[in-house]
Every structure is written in structure tokens, then in C-alpha cells.
UniProtKB/Swiss-Prot annotation:
Protein's membrane topology: Multi-pass membrane protein
Disulfide bond entries: none
Family annotation (InterPro entries): Glycosyl_transferase_4, PNAcMuramoyl-5peptid_Trfase, PNAcMuramoyl-5peptid_Trfase_CS
Gene designation per UniProt: mraY
Domain of life, source organism: Bacteria
Record key words, sorted: Cell cycle, Cell division, Cell inner membrane, Cell membrane, Cell shape, Cell wall biogenesis/degradation, Magnesium, Membrane, Metal-binding, Peptidoglycan synthesis, Transferase, Transmembrane, Transmembrane helix
UniProt-recorded name of the protein: Phospho-N-acetylmuramoyl-pentapeptide-transferase
Localization terms from the record: Cell inner membrane
Amino acid sequence: MFYHLLYPHHDLWSVLNLFQYVTFRTIMAILTALLISFVLGPWLIRKLQSLQSSGQPIRKDGPERHIIEKAGTPTMGGTLILVAVLVATLLWAKLTNPFIWLTLAATFGFGAIGFWDDAEKLIHKNPKGVPGRTRFLLQTLIVLAIALALKFYVNPEVFGKLAFPVFKDLVIDLGIWFFPFAVIVIVGCGNAVNLTDGLDGLAIGPAMFTAAAFALISHAAGHYNFANYLGIPFIPGASELAIFCGAIVGAALGFLWFNTYPAQVFMGDVGALALGAALGSVALMTQHELVLAIIGGVFVIETLSVIIQVASFKLIGKRVFRMAPLHHHFELKGWAEPKIIVRFWIISIILALVGLATLKVR
């Protein structure tokens, strides 16, 4: 909004030239989302505590200590992230950019599903919430609508292709398979972040690092000279996604203030599903889906641990891990919760750097 209001007057006041720069608006989006999180966080936590007498229902099949230590902690704190991201993005992004509206649609669509799921858990005291098939169907419909818009409205010639990291000219035309591929990327990422959100601050840290990395990728992909130099797909308009990613970074950092161990609030499905969908959408729109699997490797590992655990038990009747997702395995091995969280963050930072390195290694 500020771009449309202020930049047209840069001839009268040269300082308004700043608003043409994506880097400046990205930094301001980070600070705006961070400020909103800090200001609204305490009020929202008090409000959630008053509405949720017993806090988030704790899974009975999880680690026993969670029943004691985490009981009574309010959930649905992800609404704070959504508000901060929305306001910061609307203030600092170009509102004529279709990528902004499509990423917001994915984020808030998945956020709405997560909100419903959280509400079901609280109202009916059922940790399972909305049936999995219902969630998957709704998520799929949202992603298909976004994929159709990208393919037939935004840029038919650009979307529908899969670019491989490291290999400069290796691009595959997915054709009709672009649509199920989009579902795998966005729905998969949304649920992977949700699976990871099992310890205080565990999911929000890697989500923040992934968003920061994709802010750089988006800026490069939307700048012809940068994209040409790096040998990555040039996506006209994608640089505005850096502002959206910046808003996620600021909102995540602000939320972490309240979610760090011991957490005052949990993000809930409303936050985890929304963040995952946001990251998956940005990866799809910048054609860096495979790089997302590297940068968001913590989410991939957590998801694979669940798949391996279930498959192993069904096939041979034995479990590979003491408990899945993987962070629970380390809990049962006696690792302190803060140690697990920080080590997963360290791994996430390393993977983000590796993912960014693939931009240059061609």
C-alpha cells in the first residue's frame, strides 16, 4: 500500500525513491511484522487463556511428560502470525502483484482449515480434530485453484515446469502433472510443518530460516540480471515475494518470543498449516520446489520419520524409532527439550546455507 501511496510522489521528495526497492520494503515488512507480534502478543495470549480453560488437548500417545508440563498452555497462537504477516504484506508489497494475492490465499486458506481443526480439538476435547480426509480434500482444492491461476492466468509459459538445482539447463515440462505436483509441494509442506510443531519453538525456527532463504531466492528469481547470472528461472514479478517472506520472518521472530521454551502459547494447526502452505507456495512460484526440500530439510526428515515408523510397523511389526516424529525419539532417549530444539535449528541453518549454495553451483 505504501508503494502505491508514496512512490508516485518521489519527484517531489527524493527520499520516496526508497519505496521502489524490494530490499527496503522487505526490511520494513520484517520490522512491521515483528512490532505487531510484540504489541499484540501479550493481549492475544491473555485472550486465548480466558477462552481456553484447559488449553490445548495433549495427545495421550505422546511423551508422558507432555501431559504434565504442557497441559494448560493455550493454542491457536498462529493467529498472531497470520495477522502480522497480513498487515505487513499489505503495507509494503505491490498490491497489483498476483503472486502476493495467491500466496495470501494459500496461507489463509490453510490457516482457516487449521483454525477449524484447532476449534474442533478444543470444543470436543479431541486431539485428532477434523478428520484427515476432510482436511486433505480442502487443502487439495485450495492448491488446485492456485495452480490453475498460475498456469492459465499469471504466466502460462513459465509455470508447469520443474527446474533442478545444480544442473543449469535441466528443466522438465510437467504438463498436466503440474497440478498434482503442486498439491504434493504445498499440501506436503503444510502438513510437514504441522508434524514438526511438537516442541516449544521447534517448528517456528526452521520456518523462519526457510522464509529468510526464500526471501533471497525470490528477489533473485524476479530480477532478470540476477536470475541470468545465477542460471535460475526468471519469474517476472517474483521479487515481490521477498516482502511476503520478510513478513513471515518478522512474524515468526516475534512469535518465537512467546513460543520459546517453556512456551506461553502454541501456534496450533492454524499457524503450522498456514506457514507450511506459505513456504510451499513461494517455492512453487519461484520454481525452487526441490530446493525447498533441501532448505526445509528438517520438515522433510520429521515427515519421513513418521512414514518410516508406520511402514516398518505394518510390514515387520517393529518400530524403527522409539516414537515418531523424530523429535519425540530424542525426547525418549533422554535429550532435554531445549537441546533438541536448538540442534534442529542448527541443522536448519546449515540446510538453508546448502540450499542457497545451489543457486551458484551450476
